[in-house]
Design a protein with these regions (language model features):
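SIR2/sirtuin NAD+-dependent deacylase catalytic core
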Residues: 187
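Alpha-helical scaffold domains
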Residues: 224-311
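Iron-sulfur cluster-binding cysteine motifs and their immediate structural context
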Residues: 16, 29, 190-214, 219-220, ...
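Short, charged low-complexity linear segments at domain edges
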Residues: 155-180, 208-227, 279-283
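Auxiliary alpha/beta "docking" domains used to position bulky ligands
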Residues: 1-184, 233-234
Length: 311
């Protein structure tokens, strides 16, 4: 089977396994991204996310993750919800409404790799879903999935940015897609203007240690310091402000993945309900949820902070 048939098969299987986009880029060292990442880390924009400092060489070179790698296959999976969270409740980022996307998408990637091996033969490859040293957005751009917006998110033309990004790095030669050369954000600055913590800097740079998502998910301290004393607008887990205001997301449409449907009662949980919840109940109710990343203590800390600010 030649590279043209490899490519056709990969894209057909991607649709069969529930992905909304599949693009392929040549596996190579990301020299420009390496410089940007180095500068971002040097400025301390990653805050306490010290894991970002590790495995630098792996992040910029897929051939060090999969020996003999020739192609990086990017997949997108829509998570735009049909049901919006009602106002008046602690806000949860849309990506966390349902089951943990890591588990859902990793299963699909493994099944896809199995199918490729059955149809082509032995393949050296690995799947990645936002939990390994892979620069997913860079590969998504290189594979023609979209462009990087001012808010740092990948934006698909006429579809928006509510997508999970996943990758397969394989030793197959394929026909490679071309990146979208134009930046369709133009002069729009809605995401920059709307960010209440001024976390979006020029040149598509995110100062993560000012971001609401960072403070509500990644920060492990028991107390949110006064240095971060800004308007959190009722966010208890993550933040969607810079995506919600993006004009391109008016083209988004509801996902078709049953596992991403909101966990029952999640979107209408009150502050009191969260604060009164016990650990056993939390683990049982959200055992397959991204909310486990913050742990119950983290979510309670966030809600107590909101209350202290009169929210």
């Amino acid at each position: 089977m030649n590279q043209f048939k490899h490519t056709q098969l990969i894209k057909e299987l991607a649709l069969q396994h529930g992905f909304d986009f599949c693009g392929i880029a040549e596996a190579k060292e990301l020299t420009e991204d390496a410089f940007r990442l180095e500068q971002w880390l040097a400025k301390g924009f990653h805050g306490d996310m010290h894991y970002m400092e590790k495995h630098f060489d792996l992040r910029i070179n897929p051939k060090k993750l999969v020996p003999g790698a020739k192609s990086v296959i990017t997949f997108l999976k829509n998570y735009s919800p049909e049901q919006e969270q009602p106002s008046g409740f602690p806000k949860i980022a849309k990506y966390a409404y349902g089951q943990d996307y890591h588990e859902v998408i990793k299963l699909a990637l493994n099944q896809m790799l199995d199918d490729l091996r059955q149809k082509i033969g032995p393949i050296e490859g690995r799947g990645f879903v936002d939990s390994a040293p892979v620069l997913e957005r860079s590969w998504a751009w290189l594979s023609g999935a979209g462009w990087i917006g001012k808010n740092g998110n990948l934006i698909q033309p006429k579809k928006g940015s509510y997508f999970f990004i996943a990758s397969l790095i394989v030793d197959l030669e394929c026909v490679y897609d071309q990146p979208i050369a134009k930046d369709y954000c133009g002069t729009c600055t809605k995401c920059i203007d709307a960010c209440p913590t001024q976390a979006i800097l020029p040149n598509k740079t995110i100062e993560a240690n000012h971001c609401i998502s960072y403070y509500t998910i990644e920060l492990k301290k028991q107390q949110i310091e006064t240095a971060s004393d800004r308007s959190y607008q009722d966010w208890a887990f993550g933040c969607d402000i810079c995506q919600d205001v993006c004009p391109w997301n008016r083209f988004s449409h509801p996902h078709q993945e049953s596992k991403f449907k909101p966990i029952e009662g999640l979107l209408t949980m009150s502050k009191d309900a969260w604060l009164e919840m016990e650990e056993v109940s939390f683990k049982a109710r959200f055992k397959q949820s991204p909310l486990l990343r913050s742990k119950l203590n983290g979510i309670k800390r966030n809600i107590e902070y909101l209350r202290s600010r009169g929210r």
